[in-house]
A protein has these predicted regions:
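Alpha/beta-hydrolase superfamily serine-hydrolase fold, recognizing
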Residues: 1-148
Length: 148
């Protein structure tokens, strides 16, 4: 039994329609065109590659175990700590998942790190956001453990 999940910018919807529903304008109206283009390209053009790398079998794309955003009952999820990045092409999936967990009554703590992108955690010691996220995540995890 798992009572807490800690998620850093996860892919939460591999379904074949998912890249059509994410709006690049959600990243801000003042988003530099180059950044907007990269976000759009990652969300659309590379999605098939992402599915292949994570799932192997395209038949699993619509399985709720692979695509938790398709889940019918969010109450079965454990309390969740979610970290994502401002310019992450998966950010909107993360935010939708957080909303669904919250609506289902699941305790959830969400932090979006401004000014960074998918994979920022790999830059511990170089990006303040990576260092800050580790400290925040550990603190939140201990809070969750104390309340459990």
């Amino acid at each position: 039994y798992m009572n807490t999940q800690i998620l850093y910018y996860p892919a939460l919807d591999f379904s074949d329609h998912s890249y059509d529903v994410w709006d690049v304008d959600a990243y801000g109206k003042d988003l530099h065109p180059m950044v907007a283009g990269k976000v759009r390209a990652l969300a659309q053009k590379n999605f098939g590659t992402l599915c292949q790398a994570y799932l192997g079998d395209p038949a699993l794309m619509n399985d709720e175990l692979a695509s938790p955003l398709l889940c019918a009952d969010y109450q079965k999820f454990p309390q969740t700590i979610m970290m994502t990045a401002e310019f992450d092409f998966l950010r909107q999936q993360c935010e939708e998942f957080v909303q669904k967990l919250d609506k289902a009554g699941v305790k959830v703590d969400y932090t979006m790190f401004a000014g960074t992108f998918h994979g920022f955690l790999e830059r511990i010691g170089f990006f303040d956001q990576a260092d800050d996220s580790i400290h925040l995540m550990v603190g939140k995890w201990f809070e969750f453990l104390e309340e459990a």
